[in-house]
Amino acid sequence: MKPITVTQLNEYIAKILRSDINLSKIVVIGEISGYRYRAGKHIFFDLIDGNSKISCNIWESYRGYIDEKIIDNGKKVIVIGSVNPYSKNGTYSLNKR
């Protein structure tokens, strides 16, 4: 077996995630944790349940489609989005769509 670099591994995993149609529009229910935003820009939080968490992003261009008053730590929400990898860090997040 030929060794590969970390970059090659992360890019390979990202390619798999991007090509999975089930992850391009997915509905996820969970509780908001770690809510933060950049004034007038993007919203960031973790979506958690009893066992797991996933980072979530709501980009500025999608903020007009949501009621920001309901976004707060501890609130149970449903997020419709896509799973997007960030190969540089070997991470992925749920992005609001």
Protein language model regions, located:
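OB-fold and OB-like single-stranded nucleic-acid-recognition modules
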Residues: 1-97
